[in-house]
Each structure stands twice: as C-alpha cells, then as structure tokens.
Amino acid sequence: MGYTDQRFDVNLSILFTELPLLERPAAAAAAGFTAVELWWPWIDTATPEQSELDALKKALEDAGTQLVGLNFYAGQLPGPDRGAVSVPGEESERFRANIDIAADFAASVGCKALNALYGNRVEGVDPAIQDTLALENLVLAARAADRVGAILLIETLNKPESPLYPLVSAPSAIEVVDKVNEATGLGNAKFLLDIYHLSMNGEDVSQVIAEYAAKTGHVQIADNPGRGAPGTGELPLEQLLDELKKAGYDGWVGLEYKAADAAASFEWLPAEARPAS
C-alpha cells in the first residue's frame, strides 16, 4: 500500500499562498496535482460578487484541477476565528447568508464536500445556547449540501492552537455529526479526520481510525511537530493512511501543511502518485 495508493489533494489556503488565489490552481497543477481544496477564500465577505465566484471557477477549470473540498464562510480564517456556525449575532447571520452561495458554487465546479467549522466559544454566552444555534445552522447546511449532492463535514481542531474551539476530540465531533444526521434524516454529515489536529490533542490516531473510519468523509494530514510536510515530524503518516484504507476509507486526503516553498515540499510523494485517478 503506502502513499501511492491514496488520492491526494492540495489545500490552496495553506499551500501556494505566496501566489494570488487565482494563480494557485495552476501552481498545484504544475506540481502534478489534479485535485485541490479550499477554506472559504473570501475572509472579508460571506457573499462575494458573482464575478469573483466565476473567476475562481475559471481558474480551477483552466488549470484542469478538481475542487474536492470547500469550507463554508468561517469568519477571519486565517486569523483568530474558527468558524461562524455557533457564534450568535452577525456571524451566524453571515453563515446563513453563505450557505446557498457556497453550496451552489460547489455544485458549479463538481465539489462534493462542504466543511462547516463550529466556531469558538464566546465569552458571556451560555455554551448550550451556542450549541443549539450550531445545530440549527448545521441542519440548514446539511440540507443545502444534500441539495447539490454533497456531504457536510464536521471537523475537530486542536486545543493548544484553538483553545476556544469546543470540538477538540474525535468523540466531540462525532457527537455533532450524529446529532445533525438525526435531525435531518439525510445521513450526509460526516467526520473530517485531521491527523495533525488529533495528534496535537494527544489522541490515539489509530484508535480513532478504527472507531470512526465508517463515519469519515474527508481526511487531512500534516506532520507533527511543526505542521510540515510528511517526514518533517514524527507521525507515521504512511502507516496511518494505510490503516484508513484497510478500515474502508477510500476518499480524499488533503495536504494541509505549512511549507515555505510549496513546490519543493512534495518531494516525499512520487510524481506518478500526485494526479488523482
């Protein structure tokens, strides 16, 4: 098995960021990749102009790259925010305004996975109120995703780097996944299994894979420590991806790591393994 048996995509919100957004798909293609993913690209607005959406679609198509994962609006990310789903007031309103825009854009480019970051705890707000709001918003997002034939992803982050984010263990994210599926009856809410975040939380990644592979809709990787490319840290990433394969996961593996020189950071992956089949 090994890396050559996986389907990798490049996260263009963390790699190739030295380039303007519309140049990044071509850079990923030049490095040999045919699949990419993105955080919400317009951090200052949940409702970009149609011309901006069209320009990104054209950049993806011109590069011959398939968008396989897209975040809903998530506030200032990169930045201090970790989503808007559970944040009362204007941020929740922005998220709701973004739902159909993100879903329709995903449909226009054939993207089948939409990620909704839960949002930080807000000082002075009862966590139960935030959780109720989150479920309401995630139900709306799941229905929109289903309308365009996509899944809704729920992600665990890590407590050291995101201390106000409440979903900092696999079970906490799975609980939300199950609640959304119970509320909608659609079954399209899935776990985003990020090996870097799980390891930063001190979780047994192999155990998480064994328990939750069947509920996993997308995987992301970076090595630890450092959040760099595979081989720069201490995680047995190739082994863990093999475990995912053996557990039945055959979806995408997003490369969501930091690198000063993105093109040079792919040396660990043979060129023939980069195009998605």
Where are the regions a protein language model picked out?
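Active-site acidic/histidine proton-transfer and metal-coordination neighborhood
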Residues: 62, 81-190
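Conserved beta-strand positions in the central sheet of alpha/beta enzyme cores
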Residues: 37, 69-71, 115, 153, ...
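Aromatic/hydrophobic pocket-lining residues that form π-stacking "cages" and hydrophobic walls in ligand
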Residues: 24, 55-56, 102, 141, ...
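N-terminal small/glycine-rich loop or linker at the start of catalytic domains
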Residues: 1-12, 71-86, 118-122
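Active-site-proximal loop/turn and secondary-structure-junction residues that shape catalytic pockets
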Residues: 14-16, 40-42, 73-76, 118-122, ...
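Glycine-rich, aromatic-flanked loop segments that form ligand/cofactor-binding clefts
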Residues: 60-74
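Glycine-rich, proline-tolerant flexible connector loops at the mouths of alpha/beta enzymes
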Residues: 37-61, 118-122, 126, 161, ...
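Histidine-acidic metal/acid-base catalytic patches
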Residues: 1-14, 18-32, 110-111, 151, ...
